[in-house]
A protein has these predicted regions:
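Short aromatic/hydrophobic-glycine micro-motifs
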Residues: 14, 57-58, 154
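A short alpha-helix capping/helix-coil boundary motif
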Residues: 9-11, 26-29, 81, 122-126
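Mature, folded catalytic cores of secreted/periplasmic enzymes
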Residues: 16-17, 34, 117, 121-122
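Secondary-structure end/capping motifs
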Residues: 77-158
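Ligand-binding cleft/hinge of the Venus flytrap
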Residues: 2-23, 106-107, 151
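Pocket-lining segment of extracytoplasmic ligand-binding domains
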Residues: 20-110
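Conserved C-terminal helix/tail region of periplasmic/extracytoplasmic solute-binding proteins
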Residues: 146-178
Length: 178
């Protein structure tokens, strides 16, 4: 998620004006760091974004989830395809009535942070929740993202093909479409 934040900030600021710091891993810890004044701004995912807004924080920029899960080599194409079929079905159901499914989302996160217990469905901006079908990462997008990550020094010099098996990804998505 922090990669997306860097990319969005680059749309408004020259790279040399983007100041970063080491922040805790995970939205729960980053939310706490923000609320406790340890950082001035941070990247949050839901439900912590809505929790931050509920507690007076302001959203500066936001983006949406791509819709592709990355699997390890231990996951074969058929298993990945079955997973994608299930996700597609869930996307259809949730997009048909986001409000209906939000309580499941809240319940899933309860116990991870005491603030989550205070959230209700009305605390979420449902238009922010963009559920999209899983799809392969287009090769050009993968290459562009890889080059961009290298330019920030986020990854070592590897081939994008080492990071994502484009062929396996494509096969799995084709199988799930059947």
């Amino acid at each position: 998620t922090h990669y997306l934040t860097y990319q969005m900030l680059e749309g408004f600021l020259p790279r040399e004006l983007i100041k970063t710091c080491r922040a805790p891993n995970g939205s729960s810890a980053r939310y706490d760091a923000l609320i406790n004044g340890e950082v001035d701004a941070t990247t949050l995912t839901e439900p912590y974004l809505s929790l931050a807004e509920k507690n007076g924080c302001r959203v500066i920029i936001e983006g949406m989830y791509h819709g592709t899960e990355v699997a390890s080599d231990d996951v074969d194409a058929e298993t990945y395809a079955a997973f994608n079929r299930a996700v597609k079905k869930a996307v259809q159901l949730i997009n048909a009535n986001k409000r209906k499914y939000m309580q499941y989302f809240i319940d899933r996160h309860k116990g991870q942070h005491p603030g989550i217990e205070t959230l209700t469905v009305d605390d979420f901006r449902l238009s922010r929740l963009q559920m999209v079908d899983p799809a392969p990462i287009p090769e050009e997008e993968l290459r562009r993202t890889y080059e961009w990550m290298r330019s920030w020094g986020m990854i070592e010099e590897l081939s994008p093909d080492v990071l994502v098996d484009v062929h396996r990804q494509q096969v799995a998505h084709e199988v799930s479409a059947q």
